[in-house]
């Protein structure tokens, strides 16, 4: 990688990101701007994928809200996310959990790991 690009991206990387992967349940505190006000909106769900590397790394969180599946994709190093909390560590055997989109109720549960 070009040293100039590398030096620019190192300044943008966040160091307060907890370790998490697909299958973990996370609580994302996202900053939302509404007009002139800014507030924090909490989005809690299961991480179904994590892709990319470096400054462009992203993760997708899925939750069920009102019986409808909602997915949001966040960049890991964005300043729009105030903090990420890991609520529960899940035990899965895949890196991408897109099959959860077709499952409902108890079938969509993920086994928990005690850490």
From Swiss-Prot:
Pfam family, one: Ribosomal_L19
A molecular function GO annotation: structural constituent of ribosome
Gene Ontology biological-process annotations: translation
Gene3D superfamilies: 2.30.30.790
Domain of life where this protein originates: Bacteria
GO terms for cellular component: cytosolic large ribosomal subunit
Protein keywords: Ribonucleoprotein, Ribosomal protein
Family annotation (HAMAP family): Ribosomal_bL19
Function: This protein is located at the 30S-50S ribosomal subunit interface and may play a role in the structure and function of the aminoacyl-tRNA binding site.
Assigned protein family: Belongs to the bacterial ribosomal protein bL19 family.
Name of the protein described by the UniProt record: Large ribosomal subunit protein bL19
């Amino acid at each position: 990688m070009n040293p100039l690009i590398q030096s620019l991206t190192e300044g943008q990387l966040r160091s307060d990101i907890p370790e998490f992967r697909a299958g973990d349940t996370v609580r994302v505190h996202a900053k939302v701007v509404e007009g002139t006000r800014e507030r924090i909106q909490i989005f809690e769900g299961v991480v179904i994928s994590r892709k990319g590397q470096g400054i462009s790394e992203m993760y997708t969180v899925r939750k069920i809200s009102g019986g409808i599946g909602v997915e949001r994709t966040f960049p890991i190093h964005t300043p729009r996310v105030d903090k990420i909390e890991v609520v529960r560590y899940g035990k899965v055997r895949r890196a991408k959990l897109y099959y959860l989109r077709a499952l409902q109720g108890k079938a969509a549960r993920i086994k928990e790991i005690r850490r």
